[in-house]
Structures are given as C-alpha cells and as structure tokens.
C-alpha cells in the first residue's frame, strides 16, 4: 500500500503505521478477535466513499448524490443475506456494540430485564455488564458456566429465566470455546415471553461456512461484527432470519389510518436516527467486499482450517497440562486457565509479547484476580490461519508458548524470550501475508 504522500505530509503517523506493519508481519497474532483483512477490503476502506454523507437508507437518503453509495450498500446487504440465509440485514452499525445497542434500544425500555452470559465467564460488555450501557440502563441478570464442566448449563439458564422473567435473552460470547444451542435458548425464551438475540460476533465466519449451529431459524435477532472470523473491516451488522410484525405496539400512519410496523422498520429507525447519523460508507463498501470474499468456496476451506488449527492447539496444550476451560474447543478460540502454572494472565501476555507472540490476558470463570491481572489467556487461530497456518505450525506455536510460560519465573527468561522470538520470525517468513494484511 503506497504511502508516499502520507510520509511527506505526516511523518509521525507514517512512522506509527510503518511500525505496526512490521509488528503484524514479524509476530504471531493469536488474539481471537483479530484477523487480517484482504488488500481489496483495505482499498475499499481507504476509498473516496469516506467523503460521502448518506444519512438514511438506499433510496431514502437525506442527502443528494447518494446513487453510488446506494449501490455499495445494496450490494453489501444482498451479499450478507445470501451469506447467512436471512431476510433482513442492516449493515450500518459502526461496531458490534452499536449493533447490540440498536437491538436493545429497539425492544426495551429503561429498567427492563435482560439476561446474558457473565462477562467473567466469557460474555461481553454489552450483554449486561455493570460498566456498560447494557447493565446501567437495564436490569441485567447474568448466567454463567458450570464450575465443573466450564460449559453453559441450559437447565440453570431456564431456572434463572423463569425466576427473572426477562424481556430479552442474549446468547453469545467473547471467550467461550463451545457452540450455542440456539434452539434450546429459544425454547427458554418462549417459556417466559422473551425476545432472543444471538451475538455471533466471534464465530460468524464459522457459522456462515456451515460449521456451527445456525441461529437464524431460532433467534429473533442476530448481531455480529464484520471483522474477526468474517475477515472484513471493523464494523457491525444486525440480521433477522425472518422479518415479523413488531409486538411492541409501534405503528405508522398510512393513508387509510395506520399499520403495525415491521420489526425491520423498528430496527432501522433505531440505528438511524436512533443512535447514529451518517453511516461510514467506505466501511460499508468494504463490508460488501468481505461478504463477497466469504461467499467464495475458498472461504469455507479457510473456516475449516481455523477450527482444525484451534482443535490441534487445544489438544497440544492439554497434553502439556494446561487447563482449557470447558475441556476443549469447537470453534476458533480457547481460554486457558494458568493457575496450575502459577503464572497470571498479565505476566503471560507480557512475556509472550517479548517473544513475538500476541495474546490477551483474560478472566476465567470463577477467577479470583482482577480484570487487569486475570488468571488466564485467550488464544485464537483466525489471523494466523489467514497467513496459511496448518496443524504442524499450530503444534509448534504451542511449543513456543510453553517454552516461555514454563520459564516465566526463571532467571533465564529473557534468553528464552529472545530464542523464541527468533523462531517466531523464522515462522513468519514461512507464512507470508500475501493478499492479506500489510504489504
């Protein structure tokens, strides 16, 4: 990507970007929520569509001159519908959090009750955390995982729902390595008259590839990010398998009186003008590019390899006496409890960073340490699989990580990190980014 003009005009930003290019090229990216977007996606992100205001929706804009951004947004919507097999898509949310906010604001009033997976058990801030709008504006109740199995117990979810009687149940996670039984969640939601929202931000690419349970037949709403396993630009999206008349009593005036608004109309209005103004048309164009890529047969091959690599890593870690929360993985990530290794997540993250391996510290279920220290790390395979990682590489990477963590308290840790970093650089040369990530 040519940056001659930027180099001449703003050396500070140019130097920061150049350093980030070097970091992405020469280190192993194992943060589960990160990936490498294609050059085509990045070109769309940097296109002239960043200059265009387009409040509203295709064919119903508040600004003139939107005929070409309309084409881009319609392509993005149509491709997303085909990719996920759904009737309704809104590609305008700026982020996954914006998408979740749009749904919550559309169907809830302040003080309404919601249920979501506890943040410390693998959930997300927007699923009811007290430091987030979802836990401040609404009465949030959190379900967790079983202490013994590390998995969600649907019997306990049902018990809580029957006691709490929430208006919305959220099923989804940011650090949970098992799949979700969306049908079972819908059965619970129906028993208490609740809406059901699936947040598939993490496994969206695997779901699109048909490798995990499909939420569309069971959930009223499905939200996602467009990066992570979808390998697109940073952004959000809201979907519905089938549109339906809203049961909230929201109507619209017509020439003959009034009619009940479809739920799609309610969601659209909540995104714009409810919580956003002008959409990011350059990002929406890039979303369309990414969805087009995900519709190609090669994307399923990629998704299969993502899951295979994760399974191999989890098995190898277990063989080295690392505790994988829930006992293994069925998706792209794993959460490792390091308490039996006497290393905190913070220490592990920092030491691995010194060795050229990027992970994130993460709380584990029933953690006794703060979110700034944690007892675990989260590891994912999407980014390295984009670079061409196969099972043999995955096994070697586990070996790199084990060498560092095993020496964490030793006097020779600096030497170990330096040796691993040398091995990491060699692997990175064998796994070039090619058409993905920085040049």
UniProtKB/Swiss-Prot annotation:
UniProt keyword annotations, A-Z: Amino-acid biosynthesis, Cytoplasm, One-carbon metabolism, Pyridoxal phosphate, Transferase
Pathway as given in its UniProt record: One-carbon metabolism; tetrahydrofolate interconversion; Amino-acid biosynthesis; glycine biosynthesis; glycine from L-serine: step 1/1
Pfam families attached to this UniProt entry: SHMT (PF00464)
Residues where (6S)-5,6,7,8-tetrahydrofolate binds: 119, 123-125, 370-372
Example GO biological process: tetrahydrofolate interconversion
Reaction equations catalysed: (6R)-5,10-methylene-5,6,7,8-tetrahydrofolate + glycine + H2O = (6S)-5,6,7,8-tetrahydrofolate + L-serine
Cross-referenced InterPro entries: PyrdxlP-dep_Trfase, PyrdxlP-dep_Trfase_major, PyrdxlP-dep_Trfase_small, Ser_HO-MeTrfase, Ser_HO-MeTrfase-like, Ser_HO-MeTrfase_PLP_BS, SHMT-like_dom
N6-(pyridoxal phosphate)lysine modified-residue sites: 228
Location(s), subcellular: Cytoplasm
Any one Gene Ontology cellular component term annotated for this protein: cytosol
Documented EC number(s): 2.1.2.1
Annotated site residue numbers, Plays an important role in substrate specificity: 227
Metal-binding keyword on record: no
NCBIfam families found in the cross-reference section: PRK00011.1
Family of this protein: Belongs to the SHMT family.
Role of this protein: Catalyzes the reversible interconversion of serine and glycine with tetrahydrofolate (THF) serving as the one-carbon carrier. This reaction serves as the major source of one-carbon groups required for the biosynthesis of purines, thymidylate, methionine, and other important biomolecules. Also exhibits THF-independent aldolase activity toward beta-hydroxyamino acids, producing glycine and aldehydes, via a retro-aldol mechanism.
Subunit and partners: Homodimer.
Protein's name in the database: Serine hydroxymethyltransferase
Source species: Chlorobium phaeobacteroides (strain BS1)
